[in-house]
Amino acid sequence: MRNAIFATPLVSDFFRQYWRFLWRVGACRGVYANYREASKACAAFKKHGYNDALFYGPAIIGEPVHMRKRDYPVLYWLSQSLKEGTRILNLGGNAGTEYFTYRQFIHFPDGVRWIVWELPAAVNFGQHLAQVSKSPDLSFTTRLEDGDGADIVLVAGALQYIEEDLPTCLKRLSALPPRLVIHRTPLYEGETFFTMQSTYGSVVPYRIQNRQELADSLLKLGYRMVDCWCEQRSVIIPFYPARSSDRFYGFYFVLDDSPDPTWKTDAIETAMEVRKQIRHPWSN
């Protein structure tokens, strides 16, 4: 009987909303029109925001790295794009998580520069890691403009936490980067909104964006979608079932001065078809 009661939608949502929210990493609460509203709601909690060393300290060098199948598209496109002197701008790259992980699986040619744009707490810890690991090709900054001249922009699991949307971030650079790799981003078919997410004892704003809106915003900048991938992974917003997302997406875009018009219509579906024709090393 007790299990049946907790299985009912209303009781289940109430349990997630008020009982488990602060104690369950990744739990979400509320729907807000923009980042400012969500941030204001987060401020009602004793601990809020991302600028805390607690979020970055666990990224310790030397621990075993276990790749997941979802990460292989990123490895593939990076391996196809890296060449001598390539500059990578890693948006929200924590304390170098992607750098330390990916370099164990793909070759970094001479002169590759990996720049992480992050909050001060991540930058401080990341600089320490770069020093102790003797990684002169890894640097950190709180200034997005320090990424000027980037050949690749990589954002993996961080786009949903950044106040500005991706086109706005890209326009702050002196020139649009030729390649974009987007990974682990929650998207759905409804209207873009923000919610609050519980993360290691803190509460932070969290964006869930309309899938086609994200793609179209980059196509309008002149990018061409080459690949798209997704995984089934849920973000549940209690009391707002229509706002919940059940998939995280990844994309590979290239800047195209003369885009083929066929890429402008149903871009995501087109990329999915192209993906079937690409022989990835993990698809055997």
What are these regions (language model features)?
Residues 93-139:
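Class I SAM-dependent methyltransferase SAM/SAH-binding core
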Residues 85-95:
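Conserved class I S-adenosyl-L-methionine
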Residues 161-176:
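A short, conserved alpha-helix within the catalytic core of class I
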Residues 32-84:
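Class I SAM-dependent methyltransferase Rossmann-like catalytic core
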Residues 204-229:
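Short alpha-helix
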Residues 1-43, 270-284:
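Membrane-proximal basic amphipathic "stem/tether" segments
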Residues 177-196:
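Conserved beta-strand signature within the Rossmann-like core of class I S-adenosyl-L-methionine
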Residues 151-165:
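A short SAM/SAH-binding and catalytic strip from SAM-dependent methyltransferases
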